Structure formats: C-alpha cells, structure tokens
Regions:
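Short amphipathic alpha-helix that is part of the acyltransferase structural core
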Residues: 1-23
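Mixed-charge, low-complexity intrinsically disordered regions
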Residues: 2-8, 126-136
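A short helix-loop-beta-strand connector motif used in the catalytic cores of GNAT acetyltransferases and
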Residues: 24-40, 52-56
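Glycine-rich phosphate/pyrophosphate-binding loop shared by adenosine-nucleotide-utilizing enzymes
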Residues: 42-48, 78
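Short alpha-helical interface patches
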Residues: 47-51, 55-62
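Acyl-donor binding region in acyl/amide transferases
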Residues: 58-130
Length: 136
C-alpha cells in the first residue's frame, strides 16, 4: 500500500495528511479488491478505486462526500471514487471505461463527485456505452 501512498504524495491536496490518513482512506477499496493500480514500464503511474453503494450510502456521499467503511460494498449503485495518475491518463480512462462496461454492461449508470478543497461542486454521471469495450 505504500506505493499507492507515494503516488498520492504527488498531489498537494494530500500533503497535509499523514500516511496513516491516506492508508485509512484507501484501505476499504484495497480490502474489497475494488481498485486498480496502473503501470507504465513497471512503474506505478496511477490508481483507480470504486464503490458499490446502497441508496442510503449514496445519499450520504452526495451530501457529505464521505463513505463509511461498511458502505464500500453495500449496494448496487456504482461510484467511481477516484483516479489519480502522474501519466497515461488517457490509457487509464480507457481501461476504466472498458472495465466498467465489461463488469456492468451497456446502458448502466456510473456516478462520481467533483470536489475542490474538500467541497463538492458537481455531481456527475454517465451511462456505459458499447464503444467503450475493447476488441479482445
């Protein structure tokens, strides 16, 4: 988990946090295998995590911007929690779209929050699309 914490250290918004705070923040997604580490030439360049929220947990996230430990895998509402990266954003987002569509199917709603300095400024959602799937 230290490699992910080191990745977070590239962003000023996390520099006021102790390593233990970041660990606490990402631990639920790690324990539930609701994350992906992204590599380029064997170097960690990105991290993505997500949650499956109940209606109640979704309401709390939308209003307060927090997810309780027990809520990370509590329902059928899919939330893209975060993607951080130091490079390869286009490839990481392509992987994310493909993975979401393979996992949930076409026409499913994916939600996320936009924040700035711990303040929620936009709720967003998108519907998965067939053209997000890679030919394999």
């Amino acid at each position: 988990m230290q490699d992910i914490i080191s990745l977070y250290r590239n962003y000023p918004k996390y520099n006021h946090l102790k390593d233990s705070d970041i660990k606490h923040y990402i631990r639920p997604s790690i324990l539930l295998n609701q994350y992906k580490k992204h590599y380029n030439n064997n170097k960690l360049v990105g991290f993505t995590n997500w949650a499956y929220l109940s209606d109640k947990a979704q309401d709390i996230l939308q209003n307060e911007g927090v997810i309780s430990y027990q809520d990370w895998n509590s329902g059928n509402n899919f939330w893209h929690i975060e993607t951080i990266c130091i490079s390869n954003l286009k490839d990481i987002m392509s992987w994310s779209k493909n993975n979401l569509t393979k996992t949930f199917g076409i026409g499913k709603i994916i939600k996320w929050l936009r924040t700035d300095n711990e303040t929620i400024y936009r709720h967003s959602q998108i519907t998965t699309k067939g053209n997000w799937l890679w030919v394999q």
